[in-house]
Regions:
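Membrane topogenic/interface segments and analogous intrinsically disordered interaction regions
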Residues: 1-258
Length: 258
C-alpha cells in the first residue's frame, strides 16, 4: 500500500515537473520572439517614436515641439515604444506558445471554441488601438489645443508624459474592444444567459460612461469616444452570442426572447 502511494506521488511529481519545464520553454520561446523583433526594429526606434507621436505633433502649433525633462528620456522613451511595437508584432507567437501549452488538456469542442476566440481577441485589441491612434488621439489633441490659443498658452508635452497617456489610452480602448468576446464567452460557457445580458443593458450603458470617466482625460469628448464604442460593442456581442447559445438552453432563450 505504501509502495503504491509513493509510486503515485512520484508520478504526480514527475508530471508536475514536466509541465513546469514545458511552461518554462514556452515562456523562453515567447521572450526570444519578442527580443528578436525588438532587435530588428531598434535601429528605427526614433522613426517609430516619431510615428507614435504623430497625432500630437500634428495638433501642435507651427514650430511646436515635444520636450524632454529627463536626462535619459530621449533614449529610453523611444526604446519603450519600440518594445511595445515588438510585443504586438510577436504577440501571435506568444499566443501560439500559450495555445500549445494548454491545448493538450482541452476537449475537442473546447479547442474549436478557443481558437477563434484567441484570433478575434487579438484582432479586436489591435483594432481598438488603431481606433485610439487614428480617431481618438487627433480628435482629443486638436480639441485640447484649441483651448490654448485664447489663453495665450503654448502646448509643450514631455515625451514621457505622452507615453504614459498613450499607453493608458491604448490599453483602455484595446480592452474595450474585447467586450464582444467577453459577452460570447459568458453566454457560451453558460455563466450568464443571453436574456439576462439583454435585461441588464441599461446598467451596462451607465457602467460604460462611468468607466470612461475614470480612464479617460476629464473632458466630455474623450468620455464619449470610449463610452459610445463600448456600448455598441456590447450590442455586437449580443448579436454574435446568439450563434453560441448552448444547445441545452436554446429552448429557454427562444421562449425568453418571445
Amino acid at each position: 500500500m505504501t509502495e503504491n502511494n509513493s509510486t503515485e506521488d512520484s508520478g504526480l511529481q514527475e508530471s508536475f515537473l514536466s509541465h513546469l519545464f514545458e511552461l518554462r520553454d514556452r515562456v523562453v520561446k515567447s521572450a526570444l520572439a519578442i527580443i528578436a523583433v525588438f532587435v530588428c526594429l531598434v535601429y528605427w526606434a526614433p522613426d517609430i517614436f516619431h510615428l507614435f507621436a504623430q497625432p500630437l505633433l500634428e495638433a501642435l502649433p507651427a514650430g511646436g515641439k515635444m520636450i524632454v525633462t529627463d536626462v535619459t528620456g530621449s533614449f529610453f522613451v523611444p526604446m519603450k515604444v519600440t518594445m511595445l511595437v515588438a510585443f504586438l508584432i510577436a504577440l501571435p507567437v506568444v499566443m501560439y506558445q500559450l495555445w500549445a501549452f494548454i491545448a493538450p488538456g482541452l476537449y475537442l469542442h473546447e479547442r474549436k471554441l478557443i481558437l477563434p476566440l484567441v484570433i478575434s481577441s487579438y484582432s479586436l485589441f489591435i483594432i481598438g488601438m488603431a481606433f485610439a491612434y487614428f480617431l481618438v488621439f487627433p480628435t482629443v489633441f486638436k480639441f485640447m489645443a484649441s483651448y490654448n490659443a485664447p489663453l495665450g498658452a503654448e502646448m509643450s508635452t514631455d515625451i514621457d508624459n505622452y507615453l504614459s497617456f498613450a499607453m493608458t489610452t491604448f490599453l483602455a480602448f484595446g480592452i474595450t474592444f474585447e467586450v464582444p468576446v467577453v459577452v460570447v464567452v459568458l453566454v457560451r460557457m453558460g455563466i450568464v444567459s443571453l436574456a439576462k445580458l439583454k435585461e441588464i443593458r441599461p446598467y451596462v450603458i451607465v457602467g460604460a460612461f462611468v468607466i470612461s470617466a475614470v480612464v479617460t482625460p476629464p473632458d466630455v469628448l474623450s468620455q464619449l469616444l470610449l463610452a459610445v464604442p463600448m456600448t455598441l460593442l456590447y450590442e455586437l456581442g449580443l448579436l454574435v452570442a446568439r450563434l453560441y447559445v448552448p444547445k441545452a438552453s436554446e429552448g429557454d432563450q427562444g421562449s425568453a426572447s418571445s
